Amino acid sequence: MPTLTTKIKGSNNYFSLISLNINGLNSPIKRHRLTDWLHKQDPTFCCLQETHLREKDRHYLRVKGWKTIFQANGLKKQAGVAILISDKIDFQPKVIKKDKEGHFILIKGKILQEELSILNIYAPNARAATFIRDTLVKLKAYIAPHTIIVGDFNTPLSSKDRSWKQKLNRDTVKLTEVMKQMDLTDIYRTFYPKTKGYTFFSAPHGTFSKIDHIIGHKTGLNRYKNIEIVPCILSDHHGLRLIFNNNINNGKPTFTWKLNNTLLNDTLVKEGIKKEIKDFLEFNENEATTYPNLWDTMKAFLRGKLIALSASKKKRETAHTSSLTTHLKALEKKEANSPKRSRRQEIIKLRGEINQVETRRTIQRINQTRSWFFEKINKIDKPLARLTKGHRDKILINKIRNEKGDITTDPEEIQNTIRSFYKRLYSTKLENLDEMDKFLDRYQVPKLNQDQVDHLNSPISPKEIEAVINSLPTKKSPGPDGFSAEFYQTFKEDLIPILHKLFHKIEVEGTLPNSFYEATITLIPKPQKDPTKIENFRPISLMNIDAKILNKILANRIQEHIKAIIHPDQVGFIPGMQGWFNIRKSINVIHYINKLKDKNHMIISLDAEKAFDKIQHPFMIKVLERSGIQGPYLNMIKAIYSKPVANIKVNGEKLEAIPLKSGTRQGCPLSPYLFNIVLEVLARAIRQQKEIKGIQIGKEEVKISLLADDMIVYISDPKNSTRELLNLINSFGEVVGYKINSNKSMAFLYTKNKQAEKEIRETTPFSIVTNNIKYLGVTLTKEVKDLYDKNFKSLKKEIKEDLRRWKDLPCSWIGRINIVKMAILPKAIYRFNAIPIKIPTQFFNELEGAICKFVWNNKKPRIAKSLLKDKRTSGGITMPDLKLYYRAIVIKTAWYWYRDRQVDQWNRIEDPEMNPHTYGHLIFDKGAKTIQWKKDSIFNNWCWHNWLLSCRRMRIDPYLSPCTKVKSKWIKELHIKPETLKLIEEKVGKSLEDMGTGEKFLNRTAMACAVRSRIDKWDLMKLQSFCKAKDTVNKTKRPPTDWERIFTYPKSDRGLISNIYKELKKVDFRKSNNPIKKWGSELNKEFSPEEYRMAEKHLKKCSTSLIIREMQIKTTLRFHLTPVRMAKIKNSGDSRCWRGCGERGTLLHCWWECRLVQPLWKSVWRFLRKLDIVLPEDPAIPLLGIYPEDAPTGKKDTCSTMFIAALFIIARSWKEPRCPSTEEWIQKMWYIYTMEYYSAIKKNEFMKFLAKWMDLEGIILSEVTHSQRNSHNMYSLISGY
C-alpha cells in the first residue's frame, strides 16, 4: 500500500474534517461499524459519499456525538451524500444546497464567528470529471476562500494519483483548468507534491489511485494545518482527513477517567483487584502513613491498575485484527510499488478476513444492545422514559452574557465569566460571628436530648457502611475520582474493613482524605429560560462515592432525630411528612379567610435567591452546636465543610477549582437536613416574633409553611406584619446570607379597605396578585371555588397534550399502557393528592376516553376495558383506573385520622370549631355515629362520604371492628382510668383484637393474663361488660380484613394509596367474559380452576421479555381478528379462512386447525420428540400454556419458547395464503436464544440459560444448512462454534 501520512500527535485538539466513500449504509452492521470508526477518528466534520440511502430512509443515519446531519438522497438506493457535524461545536447553517439525485450537498454557515462552506460531492462513474466541473461552475457563487470541496471525484487530478503511468484524459484536464481559474487547489497535493498517496484499490485491476480529494481555495490554505490519508477497512476506499489550524477550545480538553463497569463482570479482573487491594495494604498500612493519605493513595493505585487492565483487555480483543491490519498495510505497500497477481489475491483474502472478524464483533455488540432492549422494551424502564421525554441534546455553552451584559462567544471569556460568577456565589464568607451569636441568643432552637446525641456520636459500624453501599443507586455518573457505585458494591467485602478504619480515624481526628472535598459541577440550562444568562443554569454537582457513603451514614443518623429539632411546619425530607400537607394547609387558610367578613390578611409565597448556595458555614456550625450536636458527629461535619472545592466543567473542560466557602454541598445526602436545621432558625424567629401576626383559626395560629426553600407565610394586619417580616428576614440574611427575591415573591392580599390596600401595595416589595400563585407544582387560587378550573382543567389539558405528542411513538399497545402508568398516572396522583376536592365524573370520562384512544392508537380496542383492568386475567398488564385512584386518595385521609397525629395542622384547621381529638374517634369508633360536617367542608366531608360508602360496599361496620382502638370513644365513655388503658396498650396491644373480646378477653397470652390481674377491679368489670357484650363479640370475633389492616396496622403511610386502590378494585370489579373460558368453549373443554391458574401464571411467567410475553397475552386474550369476527363486524356472510383453505376461519382454526398451519405444528412436535419431550398434540398447550399434569416441569421453559416462537410466525402470515415456514420459526427461536444468552451473561444466570437451551441449540444447528448459518450468523454462543 502507498505511504500513509502518520496521524498528527494531539490532532484531536484541532478542528478536523474527514471525507470517506462509505459504499452503502443500508446494512445496520455497516452503520454500527461506521459509528465505531468515527468515534476512533473523532472528526469535527465527516463527509460521506455513496450512502445509498433513499430520501425516506434518511433516519437510518444516526451517529451518537454527531447529531447534526445534512443529507442529499435520491429516490433509489444509489449515490447519496451526507455531512455530519460534531456535537462539540456550534455550527450555524445559513445556506443549504442539495442535488435531487444525491450527488452533492453544500452547506454554508458560521463556526466561532468564522465563515465556512463545505461542498460534498459524489461524482457518477460516467464522465465524472465533467460532472465535477459542471457542479463547480453551477455553484461558483458559493465558492469562496472559506470553502472546502470534498468527495469521491471518481477521477485522479494528477498523474501522481495513479500507481500506473497514464496521462489525464481530456475531461480531467478541463476540470483542472476550471479549478485553476477559480483559484482552487488539491490540498493533499499542495502539502505533499511528490508523495504517492492512494485512497482506492481496484481489486479486478490490481491498481491503486487517489480518486478521493479535498479541494481548497489557494488564498485559504493558511487555515489548514495538515492533511492525511486515513486507513478504513469497512469500505473499499480510504478516508482523507484535513486538520485546521483552529483549536476546538482554548485549552486542553479535560480527560476524566471513569471506571468501565463492564470490567467488573470479568472474573480475572475481580480476582486481580482483590489481590491488589490486599497486597497494597500489606505493604503500605503502617503508623508512618495517615489513613486519609493511605485511602487516597490506594484509589490512585487502583485507578492505575484498572486503566492497565482495561488497556490489556482491549489489546487482547483487538490483537488478531491489529495483526491482520499490519500485515495488510505491508502487502498493499509492496503491491503499490511492484504489482503481483498472487499478492493481489492475498490482499483481497486478507481484507475479507478482517471484515469478517470486525463484522462478527459488530454483530456481537449489536446483539448485546438488542438484548438490553429485549429485556426492557415496553416496560416501565429507560427506553419508554426516553421515548416520552425526547432526546436531550448535549449542552454546549457557545455564548454567554459577560459582566457588562454583552454577549460573548469567545471560549476563554465564557469560561472566565462562568468561573467568576460561581466564585462570587460560593466565596461569600461572613465574618460577623458576634452578630450570629446574638441572633441565636434571641431565637433559641430546640435541643436534642443526651440519648439522641449519644446515638449520633456512636462509632460508625461496618453494618452501617454495608447498608449504605447496598443502597447506592447504580448506573449513575461517578465523582471526580471516577470510581462508580458498582465498584464499591463489587468489592465491598474488601473495602468495608478499610472504610471502617478510615471513618474511625475521621471520627477521632476530624480530618478527611483530600478527595472527599472534591466535586465536579456541570451546568444544565433551566427550561424556557434565556441560556445566555449564567443565572439561568442549574449547577449539578458530582461528589466522590466514598464521600457520599460517609455523608449518607451521617444523614441516616440525623434523620432519626430531626423531628426533635424541626417543627411540623417544615415537611421537606422529614420522615412521615409530605409536601401536600402544606398545600392542603394553604388551601384551608384561604378557605377560612374567604369565609370572614372582616378581612385584613395576606398569604405570601417567598422566593429565596440561591438559598442552598448562600448558607454560611460558621452560622450552620453554630446552629448545630445550639441544637446539642457535639463530639465526633459535629467534628465530622466541620471536617466536611472545612475546605471543599469544586471544578466547573464547561464544554468538556474542567476550569480551575474554586473554594466553596458558603452553601450546603450539592449532591451530598446530608445537605437537605443541614439546610432544614438552619432554616428552622428563621421559621422559629417568625413564630416567636409577636409583631408578625399569624392567622388565628380556632385555637391554632397559622404562620408559616416550609418545604426546603419554598416558604409560605400567612399573616394578618399585613401593613405592619410585612414590615416586621422583612426586617426579620434582612436580619437573618445578614448572618446567614439568605436573601429574598422580591420580584419573584408573590402574595394574595385580602382586605375590603381600598385605602389600606393602596398603602400596602405601595410599601410591600412583593408582587400582589389577584388570581393565583404557583406553589409546589399546583396553582393556589385566591378563592377556593377556582381550584378545579385552575388545577384540574389544566391537568386534563396537559394530559391530552402529552397524549397527542406521544401518538406516533413506536411502541405497542402494552408499551402505551405502561407509558400511561409511568408518565400520566404520577402526574394525576400528585394533583389528586394535593387537592382532593370533588371532581365531576365527566372529567374522568374524558380522560379515560383520551387514554383509550392513545393506547389503541385511535383504532377500535381489541381487548375489553374490563379485562385490562383485571391484573389476574391480563397477564399483569393493567390499565390504571384514574377515578379509582382518585377515590383511594380521597379516602386515605382516614389513615391520618386514625393515627390522631398532633402534627397534622393541615387537617385540624379545616374545621376550627371541632375538637381536634374528634378525628381520632372516627375510624372504627363510636364518634363516627354523631359526626356532623359543615356543608362548606372542602376535604374532610368528602373523605368521610367516600370512607362510609366503601365500608358499606365491603360490608364492614365502620363503627366497631377488631381494629377499634383500646382508647376508643366506646371505652372512653366507660370512664376507665387512663393508667389502666396505658398499661393495656403497653403490655397487650392497642386494639380490641389485641385485648380480646368474649371468652378471649385478656387471656390470649401470658402477658395479657398478668395485666388482667393488675387492673383495678372496677375498670376490669367495665371492660368485661363491653368486651363480652353480644354485639361487641359478634362484630369483633373475626380477624381483621385487609381493608381494616390498611388503616390500622402500618406505622408509615408508604404505599397507602396503592393498598387502598387494590382493595377498592376488589369491590369495583366489573364482570367480563373470561377469555380462557371462551377458549374452553372453542376447544370443547371445561378447564378446572387449577388449569385457569396455570394459564394466568403462564401469561406472567412465560418470559422475562415483554416482547415475548405480549404475543402470549394477545393469544390468550383473543386479540387477533378472524374471518368469523370480521364477518360479524361487517355484517357479511364470508367467514372463510384468509389463507385460502376454504374452511370457516375461527380463532382456533387460524391458530391451529388450518391445513396450511399444521405443517409448522408438526415441525414443533418433531423438535419436541428430538428433545425427548412427550406432549399430546393438544392446542391448549401451545396456545394457553395449560400443560398436562405429567408434563416435565424442568422442560416447560424450553417448550414455551418454542410455542411462542411458532405463534409469532403464524401471526406474521395471518392473512397470507401460505404456510408459515419452519425456517422462519427456527430464525425466531434463534433470535430469542441470542437475546436470552446476552441477558443471562449480564445477570450472571448462565447455568439457567444452559439448562433451557443447550439441547435445543444443537437440534436447531443440525436443522440448518451451512449457507443458512453464514447468512444468518448462526453460530453456537455456548461453545463458540
From Swiss-Prot:
Mg(2+) 3 binds at residues 563, 566-567. Its EC number is 2.7.7.49, 3.1.21.-. Coiled coil: none annotated. Residues 1-245 are annotated as: Endonuclease activity. Residues 329-344 have a biased composition (Basic and acidic residues). Keywords: DNA recombination, Endonuclease, Hydrolase, Magnesium, Metal-binding, Multifunctional enzyme, Nuclease, Nucleotidyltransferase, RNA-directed DNA polymerase, Transferase. A motif (FADD motif) lies at residues 707-710. The keyword RNA-binding does not apply. Residues 1103-1281 are annotated as: Carboxy-terminal segment. Gene3D superfamilies: Endonuclease/exonuclease/phosphatase (3.60.10.10). Mg(2+) 1 binds at residues 607, 709-710. It catalyses: DNA(n) + a 2'-deoxyribonucleoside 5'-triphosphate = DNA(n+1) + diphosphate. Interacts with MOV10. The FADD motif is located within the catalytic core and is essential for reverse transcriptase activity. The C-terminal segment (CTS) binds to RNA with high affinity in the nanomolar range but without apparent sequence specificity. The size and flexibility of the betaB6-betaB5 hairpin loop at residues 198-212 are crucial for activity. Variation of the loop sequence results in an altered DNA nicking profile including novel sites. This is LINE-1 retrotransposable element ORF2 protein. The lineage of its organism: Eukaryota, Metazoa, Chordata, Craniata, Vertebrata.
